[in-house]
């Protein structure tokens, strides 16, 4: 209610109407659902990207074509970091475990996304060896574009993995 009063019942945020939840518990659970859904969809994109790579198919082109269907959730493969998505997923899994419930899909998605940093680092390392590079520049360090926030960034995992292979690694985040 307070939020609705502050922004006004007719107010829109990013061209969407403000939705008034019946309780803070509903609002927080809805936000968690949104973040967990994104985690699961990115895991699907990551797995599908691996499949496409094995088939010699460009995942970005596949995604663009699939997005021509109105109800396709356009999500690209990548690292999942930050202070919301993975954190909310782990919180949900802990709450479910406390209630003796299993969330197999969510757990699998989290496992897939946690493994992605190592896969990215391996691809970079293999390419560095192929071109005989001793120095790597990682462009972008925060967990998403246009933010200085580096909390739980998975680029740090990529950086650390590359350093273990004795490569000189620099980072720049424009």
Place the predicted regions along the sequence by residue.
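Active-site glycine- and acidic-residue-rich loops that bind
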Residues: 111-121, 148-149
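Conserved Rossmann-fold dehydrogenase catalytic segment
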Residues: 10, 14-38, 63-83, 101-112
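Active-site-proximal catalytic alpha-helix in oxidoreductases
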Residues: 23-52, 82-95, 114, 153
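Glycine-rich phosphate/diphosphate-binding loops that line cofactor/substrate pockets in enzymes
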Residues: 123-136
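NAD(P)-binding Rossmann-fold cofactor-contacting core
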Residues: 137, 144-174
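Long amphipathic alpha-helical segments
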Residues: 45, 49-75, 86
């Amino acid at each position: 209610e307070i939020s609705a009063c502050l922004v006004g019942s007719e107010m829109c945020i990013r061209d969407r109407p403000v939705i008034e939840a019946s309780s803070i518990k509903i609002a927080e659970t809805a936000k968690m659902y949104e973040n967990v859904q994104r985690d699961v969809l990115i895991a699907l994109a990551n797995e599908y990207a691996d499949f496409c790579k094995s088939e010699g198919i460009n995942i970005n082109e596949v995604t663009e074509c699939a997005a021509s269907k109105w109800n396709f959730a356009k999500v690209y493969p990548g690292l999942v970091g930050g202070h919301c998505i993975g954190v909310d997923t782990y919180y949900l899994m802990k709450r479910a475990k406390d209630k003796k419930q299993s969330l197999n899909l969510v757990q699998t998605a989290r496992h897939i996304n946690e493994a992605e940093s190592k896969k990215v680092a391996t691809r970079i390392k293999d390419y560095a060896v192929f071109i005989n590079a001793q120095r790597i520049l990682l462009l972008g360090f925060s967990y998403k574009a246009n933010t200085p926030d580096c909390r739980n960034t998975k680029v740090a995992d990529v950086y650390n993995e590359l350093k273990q292979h004795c490569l000189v690694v620099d980072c720049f985040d424009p």
